[in-house]
């Protein structure tokens, strides 16, 4: 930070693609608002594979949750690939102090510090001109370890809202799996009732998820295939990630973390 010559720090990743007017629109937003921290949208540049489209849907849900949390004035998530803050705010928050031993998540922890101490200084810039595109992962193992790394940060979040929301999502996915397995272990009469309940819940979940994700993807100007299959697979993937993040180890940049 002492090497920074200007007041604003703007971050992205080396493999990201930014739009032509990214900095111009960001600067305009900063001048028009009394903000000292600005979060922006990130999406994937996908190829036509199930793995990439699965990540696109998952990531769109995270982006939707991010935008929604700002909409209800309870922001808890951001992405360092499209993030900006002032040097003054960074120093007032004592930077990344307090989360030095955590493998990743500097951006989220800095955001949550800012929301806790200076909520009026934190904003979300929802503009197509400032969407940053990054690359999805190309194999399931890397995707699993990435999501475990992301999930492992949740237990040290300062935001109780994010913890409660994560718990609700986990319980919902566990309930879906439990109900599914119950279909194959009950008597016929009970199973027929469970079938009705299961498919009713499945339809409701799919409909709500679809509407919210479609709204997010409309803003991101992305499209995903295999939506139904991804929605069916996601609860299993999500629960496995959550459990593994509590008890397992993961790899990141050639290093192992627990």
Task: Show which residues each predicted segment covers.
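The conserved acidic donor/metal-binding loop of glycosyltransferases
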Residues: 13-17
């Amino acid at each position: 930070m002492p090497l920074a010559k200007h007041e604003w720090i703007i971050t992205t990743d080396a493999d990201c693609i930014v739009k032509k007017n990214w900095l111009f629109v960001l600067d305009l937003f900063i001048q028009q608002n009394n903000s000292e921290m600005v979060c922006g949208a990130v999406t994937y540049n996908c190829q036509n594979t199930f793995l990439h489209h699965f990540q696109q849907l998952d990531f769109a849900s995270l982006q939707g949750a991010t935008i929604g949390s700002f909409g209800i004035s309870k922001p808890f998530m951001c992405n360092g690939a499209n993030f900006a803050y002032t040097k003054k705010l960074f120093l007032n928050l004592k930077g990344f102090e307090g989360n030095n031993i955590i493998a990743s998540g500097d951006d989220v922890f800095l955001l949550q510090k800012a929301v806790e101490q200076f909520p009026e200084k934190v904003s979300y810039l929802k503009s197509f001109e400032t969407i940053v595109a990054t690359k999805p992962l190309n194999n399931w193992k890397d995707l699993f370890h990435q999501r475990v790394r992301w999930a492992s940060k949740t237990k040290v979040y300062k935001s109780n809202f994010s913890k409660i929301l994560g718990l609700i999502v986990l319980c919902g996915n566990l309930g879906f799996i439990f109900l599914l397995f119950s279909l194959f272990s009950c008597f016929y009469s009970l199973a027929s009732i469970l079938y009705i309940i299961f498919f009713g819940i499945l339809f409701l979940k799919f409909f709500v998820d679809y509407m919210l994700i479609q709204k997010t993807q409309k803003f991101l100007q992305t499209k995903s295939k295999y939506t139904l299959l991804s929605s069916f697979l996601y609860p299993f993937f999500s629960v496995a990630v959550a459990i593994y993040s509590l008890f397992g180890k993961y790899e990141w940049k050639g290093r192992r973390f627990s």
